[in-house]
Amino acid sequence: FPLVVAANRDEQYDRPTQPSHFWHTNPDILAGRDLIANGTWMGISKKGRFAAVTNGSQSVPKFKAAISRGTLTIDFLKGDMSAEKYASYLSARSKLYNSFHLLLRDPSSMWYLESKPTNTLSKLQQLTPGIYGLSNGGIDSGWNKCRIGEGKMSAILQKDEFEISNLMEVVSDKSLAPQPPLSSLGLKREEDPLISAQFVSAGTYGTRC
């Protein structure tokens, strides 16, 4: 497979959301939909395009006038710009958004863009073939939940054949991962230790899909 993705969306349980479906406004796009901002956290298109976004850590200041980060993904899926050009374009406009981590793939390449409004420069990186774990801390944050997930995915992908159920076992794991001091992760919620699991259940917040 050119691309294998196993992912969860962690969000407030009461945030209105539609599960993955082909959008009637853009029938080539398969994605979930956030019904507040009308964007998406992850999706694919029939043109072989893929996009996914996570919010930056809670320690980064936010501003109310920011454009919804869910538009970062859907605009790429709807468009024809290459992943590299789109990522470069966003890099110059990243201060219009609150902190984010963005994955973009077209049929020829895959790119990662990390942006924090407090930084003078965003991070733009082409991803070579490999296994990557993305969290709210970024693609190279070293979060233990990501390292554990990467290890499990590596074991699955080394097999000649695997089932979707194998991927589901990875993202449905509720085991808590060992954690460094929470201050180093930029986390603030009282339930932060619970967020170390692949499948999060923390009061009013947790894994939605």
How should these model regions be labeled?
Residues 1-209:
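N-terminal nucleophile
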